[in-house]
């Protein structure tokens, strides 16, 4: 690949919000049964994004479910959680944000063989990729070497969001790590970039393509979906955010959905809870993870309850 193309793809990666890759594409409703399973039953703890965590005789801690966006309304909504962080001893995050993330993501999102996206998807889908990709400033030949999941990442946020990121405007999640770094607060990552990329690259390619086929034909639709997501977050409904993604992956078979749940939601929730438990027992910590992790029978909050912690919504 020519050096100019590599440079352009590095810019593409830098314009993306990495965590959105999981939040808007693959985080789905925590169920392993077919979609007929009771929605209300599966979405316990879905009515708030900020929760107080108590128990084990430790000082209280908090967990904040975010929408990782640079939209000013979203960042401003985190003001109270920012205050909690300034008085905390620990900040726990799903993944540490640093420059190494971009290069590692770049290394796995492109095909390194002779496969090309144009040959994998339908002509109709690739036409949508070309048309919408142009709105982000990318040419068809650039999009053509992306793996299906990576192409989906590009379109998981609208051009307005990508433009803000390219200008250096910080996302909500990044603001927490900025504050922690400024004040010398210990940052505890709950997962590594390598773990997340391994999961992404192992996804069934046919399922990746099926999700990519649902790409809207017009950029206005992408913007509209994103605004709905913002509104759901501002209404503090992690359950509504959860439902959004359930609707998106409903194009997959129940078996494929169950596999996605286990690898991309359930297993990650269990892993994060096991890694945050030590700091929670010490107390006075703030955990910041995507809001879609919070609700459901196998959500982070229910898993913490099962370990003896008391959770209380903070409105």
Segment roles from a protein language model:
Residues 23-34:
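Bacterial N-terminal signal peptides
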Residues 45, 76, 267-271:
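Short secondary-structure boundary/capping elements
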Residues 41, 49-260:
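Structured, acidic catalytic/metal-binding patches in enzyme active sites
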Residues 6-25:
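Bacterial N-terminal signal peptides that target proteins for export
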Residues 258-315:
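A cross-kingdom marker for long, charged
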């Amino acid at each position: 690949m020519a050096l100019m193309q590599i440079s352009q793809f590095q810019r593409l990666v830098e314009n993306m919000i990495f965590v959105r890759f999981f939040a808007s594409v693959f985080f789905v409703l925590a169920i392993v049964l077919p979609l007929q399973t009771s929605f209300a039953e599966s979405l316990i703890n879905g009515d708030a994004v900020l929760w107080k965590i108590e128990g084990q005789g430790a000082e209280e801690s908090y967990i904040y479910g975010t929408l990782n966006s640079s939209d000013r309304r979203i960042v401003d909504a985190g003001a109270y959680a920012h205050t909690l962080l300034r008085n905390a001893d620990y900040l726990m995050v799903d993944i540490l944000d640093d420059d190494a993330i971009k290069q590692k993501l770049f290394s796995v999102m492109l095909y390194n063989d002779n496969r090309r996206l144009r040959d994998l998807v339908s002509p109709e889908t690739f036409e949508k990729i070309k048309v919408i990709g142009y709105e982000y400033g990318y040419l068809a030949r650039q999009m053509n070497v992306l793996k299906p999941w990576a192409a989906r990442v590009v379109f998981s946020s609208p051009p307005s969001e990508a433009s803000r990121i390219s200008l250096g405007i910080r996302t909500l999640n990044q603001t927490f790590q900025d504050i922690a770094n400024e004040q010398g607060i210990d940052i505890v990552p709950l997962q590594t970039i390598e773990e997340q990329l391994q999961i992404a690259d192992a996804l069934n390619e046919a399922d990746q393509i099926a999700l990519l086929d649902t790409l809207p034909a017009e950029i206005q639709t992408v913007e509209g979906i994103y605004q709905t997501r913002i509104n759901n977050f501002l209404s503090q409904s992690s359950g509504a955010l959860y439902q959004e993604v359930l609707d998106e992956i409903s194009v997959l078979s129940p078996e494929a959905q169950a596999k996605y749940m286990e690898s991309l939601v359930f297993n990650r929730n269990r892993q994060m809870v096991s890694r945050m438990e030590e700091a929670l027992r010490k107390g006075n910590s703030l955990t910041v993870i995507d809001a879609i992790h919070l609700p459901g029978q196998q959500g982070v909050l229910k898993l913490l309850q099962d370990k003896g912690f008391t959770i209380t919504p903070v409105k």
